[in-house]
């Protein structure tokens, strides 16, 4: 079974840590990336769907797992929204402040 993963952000951690790991792991598929203003991810991951908001991405029924790698003050709300949307969630530390 392949797990469709969505990154909530393509900042430093998304670009340097999360996306490369997900893209190389045989059980994960880098399915979607949220970039609010830019489209930097498209050059590196052209098959990933691009969303402009986390809420828009959460509406996609194909997303299985959401990596919440956004600014700390958004972790709680995005994780809660993803769980309520029926997604599995991985949250970067710290979970909240």
Regions found by a protein language model. Give the residues of each.
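Short, Asp-centered acidic motifs that coordinate Mg2+ and/or phosphate
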Residues: 32, 64-65
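Receiver (REC) domain switch-region micro-motif
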Residues: 57, 66
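Alpha-helix C-terminal capping/helix-to-coil transition sites in glycosyltransferase folds
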Residues: 60-62
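Beta-strand-loop-alpha-helix segment that lines the small-molecule cofactor/substrate pocket
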Residues: 65, 71-72, 76-97
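Short glycine/serine/threonine/alanine-rich loop segments
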Residues: 47-48, 87
């Amino acid at each position: 079974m392949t797990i469709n993963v969505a990154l909530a952000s393509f900042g430093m951690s998304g670009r340097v840590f999360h996306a490369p790991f997900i893209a190389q792991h045989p059980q994960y598929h880098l399915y979607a990336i949220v970039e609010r203003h830019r489209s930097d991810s498209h050059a590196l991951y052209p098959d990933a769907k691009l969303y402009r908001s986390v809420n828009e991405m959460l509406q996609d029924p194909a997303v299985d797992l959401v990596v919440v790698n956004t600014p700390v003050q958004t972790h709680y709300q995005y994780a809660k929204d993803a769980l309520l949307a029926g997604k599995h969630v991985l949250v970067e530390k710290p979970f909240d402040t």
